[in-house]
């Protein structure tokens, strides 16, 4: 690509957002449901799946810290009441360790993960694009997420939906 055009759209100032944290033992079910859910979610909703060891989040019991988890990071940029209907569907993916979901300024949500990416920690990101999460890929994600070399490592699947998912190359 040598050039592309994009159009900005207003967001917020507030969005419905947060995390739902599931035990890693439920990874296959949660990730499979996530994959199917993202195929039909509305443009106002974005959900990322993260597999990692639990950081010391204040809404998780202390005995969960350091355990393998699957996280759904949710952001709904529309009417919060409508967004809660989608959050409720995500809650049904399994039996969560905990969650922290609510309305907050978009600029706060945009920075919420910054403490996990501290300067000097040699952050390295590598990406691949997939049109869908097939069962074999889900199994591979689970296999490697179960063997991450440090508590700072994670595997995440970021959805790029909306118009980008509907536009043909």
Regions from the PLM with identified roles:
Residues 1-169:
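Soluble FAD-dependent oxygen oxidases
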């Amino acid at each position: 690509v040598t050039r592309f055009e994009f159009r900005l759209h207003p967001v917020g100032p507030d969005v419905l957002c947060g995390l739902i944290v599931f035990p890693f033992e439920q990874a296959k079910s949660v990730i499979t449901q996530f994959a199917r859910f993202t195929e039909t979610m509305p443009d106002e909703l974005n959900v990322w799946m993260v597999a990692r060891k639990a950081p010391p989040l204040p809404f998780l019991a202390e005995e969960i810290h350091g355990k393998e988890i699957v996280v759904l990071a949710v952001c709904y940029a529309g009417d919060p009441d409508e967004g809660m209907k989608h959050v409720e569907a995500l809650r049904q993916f399994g039996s969560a360790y905990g969650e922290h979901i609510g309305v907050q300024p978009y600029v706060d949500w945009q920075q919420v993960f910054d403490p996990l990416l501290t300067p000097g920690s040699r952050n390295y990101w590598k990406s691949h694009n997939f049109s869908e999460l097939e069962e074999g890929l889900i199994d591979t994600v689970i296999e490697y997420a179960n063997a991450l070399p440090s508590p700072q490592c994670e595997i995440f699947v970021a959805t790029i939906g909306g118009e980008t998912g509907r536009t043909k190359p």
